[in-house]
Regions:
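Conserved non-catalytic scaffold segment of RNase H-like nuclease domains
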Residues: 2-4, 9-100, 155-158
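Acidic active-site catalytic centers that drive phospho-/nucleotidyl reactions
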Residues: 7-9, 102, 123, 169
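Short, function-defining helix-loop hinge/capping sites that tune catalysis or transport
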Residues: 15-17, 32, 105, 131, ...
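Short, flexible, mixed-charge acidic loops at enzyme active sites
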Residues: 47-56, 139-151
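Acidic, Mg2+-coordinating catalytic module of metal-dependent nucleases/exonucleases
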Residues: 93-96, 104-109, 141-186
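Substrate-recognition/cap helix-loop segment adjacent to the acidic, metal-dependent catalytic center
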Residues: 101-120
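Short conserved catalytic/interaction loops centered on acidic-Pro-aromatic/His motifs
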Residues: 114-118, 137-142, 185-186
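Short alpha-helix plus adjacent loop in nuclease-associated cores
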Residues: 122-137
Length: 186
């Protein structure tokens, strides 16, 4: 499988109105033991910002240091993917709400990356819903249990970032996916 663990942070919920603030991607070479990551913060001259989005992702608008234009981030993301996938491969985005949220922004705002990715996506919420059914558990209870376990594991990686950072959340998605996959196999 051509998995790609993906997360973005945005200035709001509407991909036609709001902007991608940062993107994190993770390619797993050997589970959590060996993975490669990509992270960029995006520089914008103008932004439409939904206050609730900033409350969640705690984005700092006071500095543009280390931020790149969206076009440069789009190009760099494709260069990153070319290191790990053959030209004929279309990596499958995996994450929480990745198809219904993240990919809507990527399809509109990062056309080079969008063209490189599969048009399909795997939403980890759907897989957890299936696991909840398998174990006769409440979905929200199972999601909290697995999320807490994944956060505890990812927090130990000393990434230098925390929850609601696109890189942290991409690694979190990988960890959560591996736990779900292991449960399905057992």
């Amino acid at each position: 499988m051509h998995e790609l663990f993906l997360d973005i942070e945005t200035s709001g919920l509407n991909p036609d109105k709001h902007s991608i603030l940062s993107i994190g991607m993770v390619v797993s070479l050997n589970g959590l033991i060996d993975y490669q990551s990509f992270y960029r913060e995006i520089k914008h001259d103008e932004l439409v910002v939904a206050p609730e989005a900033i409350e969640i992702n705690k984005y700092d608008f006071t500095t543009q240091k280390n931020r790149v234009p969206l076009v440069a981030a789009d190009e760099a993301a494709v260069i990153f993917l070319k290191k790990y996938y053959r030209p004929d491969e279309k990596p499958l985005p995996i994450g929480l709400n990745v198809g219904s949220f993240d990919m809507q922004f990527i399809n509109r705002q990062m056309p080079l990356l969008s063209a490189k990715l599969s048009h399909r996506a795997v939403d980890l919420n759907s897989l957890m819903y299936m696991l909840a059914h398998k174990h006769s558990k409440d979905f929200k209870e199972l999601k909290k249990e697995l999320s807490d376990k994944a956060h505890n594991e990812v927090s130990g990686f000393a990434l230098g970032v925390s929850k609601h950072n696109a890189l942290y959340d991409a690694v979190f998605n990988l960890c959560l996916y591996l736990m779900i996959k292991e449960d399905f196999i057992s």
